[in-house]
Amino acid sequence: SMTGFPTSADIYLEMDGRKVAVVQSYTAKASKTSQSVEAFGESEPVATIEGQKRYTLELTRLYATDNAVSDGINFYDMANFSLVICKPDRRVIYSDCQWSGIEEDGRLNAMVAEKVTVVAAKRIETSA
């Protein structure tokens, strides 16, 4: 593979400290709620308060690891997991993840999911 591009082993899901699936590719989208502060007698809001951030991740082609398979973990059982992305210079971790959608391909076995949509509460970056 070309250098600098993540291979599937560089993107994985971790649950209870164990690697449960490798992910072929992902896209990430961050959104944030905000709230206007109104003041009596003012026609415009006086301030905007930053709300909570939320990260939506679209994961493509997930393969359950042998560990997960032997533990009987499937994609539907996963909760409070992390998505770990290893880049040459840093590591990005999305934590407190929950899945919000799972797409399976009927021809693939239960150990592979075509697309999983995940919502994460936190995103941290650490140097490699």
PLM feature segments, named:
Residues 69-95:
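Short, acidic/charged, Gly/Pro-enriched secondary-structure junctions
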Residues 65-69, 126:
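Short beta-strands and strand-coil junctions in structured, solvent-facing domains, enriched
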Residues 1-63, 88-115, 128:
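Solvent-exposed edge beta-strands and adjacent loop segments
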Residues 119-126:
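Hydrophobic lipid-interacting interfaces of membrane-associated proteins
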